[in-house]
Amino acid sequence: FRSDIDGTLIPDSTPDLYPEMVEEIKKLTDRGILFCGASGRQLASIRRVFREVEDQICYIAENGTHVYYKGKDLALTAMKPEYARQIVEQLRSLGSEYEFTVSTPHGSLLETKNRLFLDMMKYGYHNIFRQVEDVLAEEEVILKIAVYHRGSIRQLGEEVLIPRWGGLVK
C-alpha cells in the first residue's frame, strides 16, 4: 500500500504524522501489507515522520528517485550529469532571490549562505544537508534539483523551466 505524505498523512511541510496513522500502519503490517510512504522529501526527513514505525515500512523519497527498505537502497534514479550541470548553471544565473537544493542519496547539497533558507531546510523540513562552494564539484549521484522562491516559482516554472526541461527531466 502506497500513500503520499504531505497534505495526506501530515500537514504540509511539518514533521509529525497524524497519531491515528501510526496505528493504521501497524494494522497493515500485522496483516502482511507493506506500507510505502511517498514524498518529494529526502529520505531522512520522511524517516523522521515515520519514526515510530520506521523499520516496518518502505520509503519512496525525492519524488520517486530514491526507494529504500530495511536499510537498503532498492532503487536510485540519477539525473543525467549533463542535465544536472545545465540546470544548476541556469538556476545560478537567476540571482540570489532563488535558492536551490541538489539532492543525493546522502542528503542535500546547498551553495546558499541564506540563513533563513538554511533554517527552513534544517528546522522546517528536518533535512540533512551540506553547504558547499560548488555542488557540481562534489562526487555525488544527483537525484533531484529543487528550486525555491519565497513568493512562488510558478512563473519561473511555467515560463522558463518547464519549456526547457519538461521533456527531459521529471
Language-model-detected regions and their locations in the chain:
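A short local structural element in Rossmann-fold oxidoreductases
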Residues: 10, 47, 158
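Short, contiguous strand/loop micro-motifs
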Residues: 11-12, 74-75, 144
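Short, surface-exposed acidic/glycine-rich loop or hinge patches that mediate macromolecular interfaces
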Residues: 15, 40, 150-152
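Conserved acidic, metal-coordinating active-site core of Asp-based
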Residues: 90, 97-170
